[in-house]
Amino acid sequence: RLMLALKTILSGADATPTLIFDEIDSGISGKSGQVVGEKLWQLTRQHQVLCVTHLPQIAAFADTHYNVNKQIFDERTMTIVNELRPEQRVREIAHIMGGDATEFSMKSAEEMLARSYLWKENWARHLPQA
């Protein structure tokens, strides 16, 4: 999280095109996750951001979601990466909220995605025009 704070403050001066945050959600939840998601998304104005997270509050801010799974084939471990379609994003966020994707968790995930979309739209609207 310290690196996130530094990158947020120095984002205009940092020429690094891609920033990678691996499990930045460790030890946080709820509102803190929301703030981390907001800060990560703000970095996308000047960088490509890749983030591994298990926190729905952070995942909801992603513009694109990928699901990463390890599978074993003939005693070899393979990593499978799939880009998720919009309906799959809802199901995945519902899943990381608490296991099985129930009707309630699906509605909560839809609301979380909608709220993050509105936040991003509002934030972008208040940026100075170039």
Describe the role of every protein-language-model region.
Residues 1-5, 26-30, 83-84:
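Conserved ABC ATPase signature
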Residues 1-19, 43:
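GG-anchored amphipathic helix commonly corresponding to the ABC/SMC/Rad50 NBD signature/C-loop
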Residues 31-130:
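C-terminal lobe/lid and adjacent interdomain/linker elements of RecA-like ASCE P-loop ATPase modules
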Residues 7-9, 26, 73:
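Short, glycine-/Ser/Thr-/acidic-enriched flexible segments
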Residues 12-14, 26-34:
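Conserved D-loop-proximal element of ABC-family nucleotide-binding domains
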Residues 22-23:
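Walker B catalytic acidic pair
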